[in-house]
Amino acid sequence: MLTERQYKLYKFLKVYAKENNVMPTFREMQQHMNIKSKSGIFNLLFYMEWKGYIKRHPAHKRAIQIIKEYENDNT
């Protein structure tokens, strides 16, 4: 189960990827989430990955893959 903030970022990732065919940058995630630091986004992504919703590839930019659908998500 995702927290409210994690779910907000999850939905943003899904919509952004669908509209742009690429995942957003950290800066775009920061702006959407109104978070000032990269570490705030990093922590959200870390726990989303730990919970099994996304997979990240640290050596590549924008390399986030949604691997698990969120329950009750209509995006």
Predicted regions, residues:
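Pre-recognition alpha-helix immediately N-terminal to the DNA-recognition helix
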Residues: K8-V15
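Glycine-centered, phosphate/nucleic-acid-interacting loop/turn motifs that mediate DNA/RNA or nucleotide
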Residues: G52
